[in-house]
């Protein structure tokens, strides 16, 4: 049975998303954001008019997540990362599992919206969530975006964050806070200090970027003690460590996934939508 909703219902959901994460914030120079699969219909029934749109939130739209949406009778998947990336010139489901998933979702009438860098850049978006998680939202002297969005005057609208604490925090405490807010049992840390000395290593200024921070960190204009991101190249990690800096990397999607449960779910529920967070979505890398 088709899960397709009316155009009016889908438009309402898109308005709810863009209310918090406007499309103009997305980095269109490379990112593929917005409504990537539109299965809405012009036909309206009494049941349609009274029904809530059921939304599944996920970071990555994989085959297992798509099946989860089908099984849960969801109408729309909001996938943080762009599902169609880079652009497709043809569909070949026999050689590309993403193409197979797209065809399946269309057959079931499930639409897909991907906000990605619009959420990265928004005030109150994923980067501000990461900043709050460093010390429970307390002790922040100042914070601003490392790379602002063109045309915006608010210095908290943009990619990445610089944050300075009122009072130093030990690396040991920051690592504990990061693992708690990201819901991960481990992170990777590069530091000249041995782990036994992390309680003595004080952190006051931090560069933060969800996902991959390498490009955004090039916009830094102030010196920092700590670089905190999802992933960074080996040579960059080595460079910062040799310069006496500390690096925390957590795997790309681990810096984004908890935001769906902690922030986005509640915002969309308050807008009148039924929202569930995927249980199948997970970082593709595990420790063996």
From Swiss-Prot:
Other noteworthy facts: Present with 6000 molecules/cell in log phase SD medium.
GO cellular-component term (any): mitochondrion
Disulfide bridges in this chain: none
Keyword flag Mitochondrion: yes
Name of the coding gene: NIF3
Self-association and partners: May interact with NGG1.
Localization (cell): Mitochondrion
Short name of one Pfam family: DUF34_NIF3
Keywords: Mitochondrion
Keyword Mitochondrion set for record: yes
Family affiliation: Belongs to the GTP cyclohydrolase I type 2/NIF3 family.
Protein source organism: Saccharomyces cerevisiae (strain ATCC 204508 / S288c) (Baker's yeast)
InterPro entries noted in UniProt: DUF34/NIF3 (IPR002678), DUF34/NIF3_sf (IPR036069)
Gene3D superfamilies xref list: NIF3 (NGG1p interacting factor 3)-like
Protein name according to UniProt: NGG1-interacting factor 3
Main location: mitochondrion
């Amino acid at each position: 049975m088709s899960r397709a909703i009316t155009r009016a219902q889908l438009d309402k959901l898109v308005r709810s998303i863009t209310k918090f994460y406007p499309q103009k914030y997305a980095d269109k120079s490379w990112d593929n954001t917005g409504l990537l699969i539109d299965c809405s219909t012009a036909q309206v029934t009494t049941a349609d008019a009274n029904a809530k749109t059921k939304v599944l939130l996920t970071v990555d739209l994989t085959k297992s997540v798509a099946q989860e949406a089908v099984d849960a009778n969801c109408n729309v998947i909001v996938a943080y990362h762009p599902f169609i990336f880079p652009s497709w010139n043809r569909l070949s489901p026999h050689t590309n599992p993403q193409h197979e998933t797209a065809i399946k979702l269309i057959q079931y009438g499930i639409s897909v919206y991907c906000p990605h860098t619009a959420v990265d850049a928004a005030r109150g978006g994923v980067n501000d969530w990461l900043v709050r998680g460093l010390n429970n939202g307390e002790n922040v002297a100042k914070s601003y975006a490392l790379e602002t969005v063109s045309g915006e005057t608010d210095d908290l609208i943009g990619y990445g964050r610089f944050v300075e604490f009122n009072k130093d925090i030990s690396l040991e405490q920051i690592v504990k806070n990061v693992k708690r807010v990201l819901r991960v049992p481990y992170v990777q840390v590069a530091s000249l200090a041995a782990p036994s000395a992390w309680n003595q290593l004080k952190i006051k200024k931090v560069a933060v970027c969800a996902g991959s921070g390498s490009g955004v960190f090039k916009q830094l204009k102030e010196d920092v003690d700590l670089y905190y991101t999802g992933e960074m190249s080996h040579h960059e990690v080595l460079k910062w460590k040799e310069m006496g800096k500390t690096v925390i990397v957590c795997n790309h999607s681990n810096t984004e996934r908890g935001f769906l449960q902690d922030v986005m779910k509640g915002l969309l529920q308050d807008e009148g939508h039924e929202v569930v967070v995927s249980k199948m979505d997970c970082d593709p890398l595990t420790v063996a």
